[in-house]
């Protein structure tokens, strides 16, 4: 795809040079990765961002590991055919738990994954009970249990897997109201506890999008923790130390696997996040 320079302001004698920036790809199966993108953009507002989401295979939570690995490799490979990438963020917990080794083996650029914020939650809990709210797939994976054993061994960790909350977050971004009673029903296993978790790890990037609704339902004072800020800091460090040589002057762009009526409804939302266009990515 040819690179189109951004129009600069003109002087009386010449047009200013376009701003050249490293290209960073943020990938998720759905729109949850926008929560991570927002954190990165806060620290690095002037990068060239691509946001790719797999609206054909969404959600990934119940997909097999082999499927997710092959799918994500294919998508990132397709994006590299459009732009030389400085860095990729896999802003999807389900994908991060299984794809990072394969991605790092294939590509030379840094690949950053999402890790549930178990370690900071274990430090912050006051009653020694940490909740992990994630997809059912993430809750079941050995990687997640290893994290808990390594960083929260002295805490009691209550895991709750839900695919419905992912759908609720997606629907919210599409402009649909959130049914608080449905959120309450999903969280009942914790709400019925005599002493529920006082610190909850949002182990899916969709869940920060509904943090207000979660706070309405969970006991007052419950802390919600996600990995977005840590990923943003890691991205800053990598770009400062990698010094990418290939730069772009293009506008930020969103990519999906299929243009549907539902994805068209997302265009105003994506524009509010700074993405000028939405295009179909061919695999």
From Swiss-Prot:
Assigned EC number: 5.1.1.3
Pathway: Cell wall biogenesis; peptidoglycan biosynthesis
Chain sites annotated for binding substrate: 28-29, 60-61, 93-94, 205-206
Protein keywords: Cell shape, Cell wall biogenesis/degradation, Isomerase, Peptidoglycan synthesis
SUPFAM superfamilies per UniProt: Aspartate/glutamate racemase
InterPro entries given in the database record: Asp/Glu/hydantoin_racemase, Asp/Glu_race, Asp/Glu_racemase_AS_1, Asp/Glu_racemase_AS_2, Glu_race
Record-level Gene Ontology MF annotations: glutamate racemase activity
Tagged with keyword Isomerase: yes
Sections of the chain in a coiled coil: none
GO biological process, one term: cell wall organization
Catalytic activity: L-glutamate = D-glutamate
Positions annotated as active site in the UniProt record: 92, 204
Gene3D superfamilies named among the record's database cross-references: 3.40.50.1860
Entry function: Provides the (R)-glutamate required for cell wall biosynthesis.
Similarity remark: Belongs to the aspartate/glutamate racemases family.
Protein name: Glutamate racemase
Protein species of origin: Erwinia tasmaniensis (strain DSM 17950 / CFBP 7177 / CIP 109463 / NCPPB 4357 / Et1/99)
């Amino acid at each position: 795809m040819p690179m189109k320079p951004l129009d600069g302001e003109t002087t009386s004698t010449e047009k200013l040079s376009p701003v050249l920036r490293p290209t960073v790809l943020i990938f998720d199966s759905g729109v949850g990765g926008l929560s991570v993108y927002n954190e990165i953009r806060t620290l690095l507002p002037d990068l060239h961002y691509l946001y790719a989401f797999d609206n054909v295979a969404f959600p990934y939570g119940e997909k097999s590991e082999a499927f997710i690995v092959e799918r994500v490799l294919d998508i990132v490979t397709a994006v590299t055919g459009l732009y030389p990438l400085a860095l990729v963020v896999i802003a999807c917990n389900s994908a991060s738990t299984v794809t990072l080794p394969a991605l790092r083996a294939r590509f030379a650029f840094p690949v950053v994954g999402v890790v549930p914020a178990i370690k900071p939650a274990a430090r912050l809990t006051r009653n020694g009970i940490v909740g992990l709210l994630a997809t059912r797939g993430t809750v079941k994976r050995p990687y997640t249990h290893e994290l808990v054993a390594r960083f929260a061994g002295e805490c009691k960790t209550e895991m709750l897997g839900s695919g419905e909350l992912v759908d609720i977050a997606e629907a919210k971004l599409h402009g649909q109201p959130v049914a608080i009673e449905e959120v309450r029903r999903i969280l009942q296993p914790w709400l019925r506890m005599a002493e529920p978790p006082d610190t909850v790890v949002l182990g899916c990037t969709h869940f920060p999008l509904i943090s207000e609704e979660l706070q309405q339902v969970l006991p007052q004072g419950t802390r919600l923790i996600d990995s977005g800020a840590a990923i943003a800091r890691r991205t800053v460090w990598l770009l400062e130390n990698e010094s990418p040589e290939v730069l772009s002057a293009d506008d930020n762009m969103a990519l999906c696997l299929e243009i549907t009526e539902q994805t068209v409804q997302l265009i105003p939302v994506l524009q509010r996040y700074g993405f000028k266009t939405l295009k179909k990515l061919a695999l």
